[in-house]
Amino acid sequence: YDAAAGKATYDASCAMCHKTGMMGAPKVGDKAAWAPHIAKGMNVMVANSIKGYKGTKGMMPAKGGNPKLTDAQVGNAVAYMVGQSK
């Protein structure tokens, strides 16, 4: 995954929820909120982000609600967010 390339996707498609914690999304940079997700591993996080995920605090629509994103773009955005949240 290319975290640097993922920043643009994050800014365009992910920040709306992950910058503010909207709908229960873990805020980028909040190590405690991200820790349980990071513990599952990148492959699980990316798969959940691509297909959608219902967690205990909310739900994430498939591809963050942007079906135009490629799986690679989603993976890169996840890598960017994880890198900012470790």
UniProtKB/Swiss-Prot annotation:
<dbReference type="InterPro" id="IPR036909">
    <property type="entry name" value="Cyt_c-like_dom_sf"/>
</dbReference>
<feature type="binding site" description="covalent">
    <location>
        <position position="14"/>
    </location>
    <ligand>
        <name>heme c</name>
    </ligand>
</feature>
<comment type="function">
    <text>This basic c-type monoheme cytochrome has been found exclusively in the green photosynthetic bacteria, although its role in bacterial photosynthesis is not established. It has an unusually low redox potential compared with mitochondrial cytochrome c. It is reactive with cytochrome c oxidases but not with reductases.</text>
</comment>
<dbReference type="Pfam" id="PF13442">
    <property type="entry name" value="Cytochrome_CBB3"/>
</dbReference>
<keyword id="KW-0479">Metal-binding</keyword>
<dbReference type="GO" id="GO:0005506">
    <property type="term" value="F:iron ion binding"/>
</dbReference>
<protein>
    <recommendedName>
        <fullName>Cytochrome c-555</fullName>
    </recommendedName>
</protein>
<feature type="binding site" description="covalent">
    <location>
        <position position="17"/>
    </location>
    <ligand>
        <name>heme c</name>
    </ligand>
</feature>
<feature type="binding site" description="axial binding residue">
    <location>
        <position position="60"/>
    </location>
    <ligand>
        <name>heme c</name>
    </ligand>
</feature>
<dbReference type="GO" id="GO:0009055">
    <property type="term" value="F:electron transfer activity"/>
</dbReference>
<keyword id="KW-0349">Heme</keyword>
<keyword id="KW-0408">Iron</keyword>
<keyword id="KW-0249">Electron transport</keyword>
<dbReference type="GO" id="GO:0015979">
    <property type="term" value="P:photosynthesis"/>
</dbReference>
<dbReference type="GO" id="GO:0020037">
    <property type="term" value="F:heme binding"/>
</dbReference>
<dbReference type="InterPro" id="IPR002323">
    <property type="entry name" value="Cyt_CIE"/>
</dbReference>
<feature type="binding site" description="axial binding residue">
    <location>
        <position position="18"/>
    </location>
    <ligand>
        <name>heme c</name>
    </ligand>
</feature>
<keyword id="KW-0602">Photosynthesis</keyword>
<keyword id="KW-0813">Transport</keyword>
<dbReference type="InterPro" id="IPR009056">
    <property type="entry name" value="Cyt_c-like_dom"/>
</dbReference>
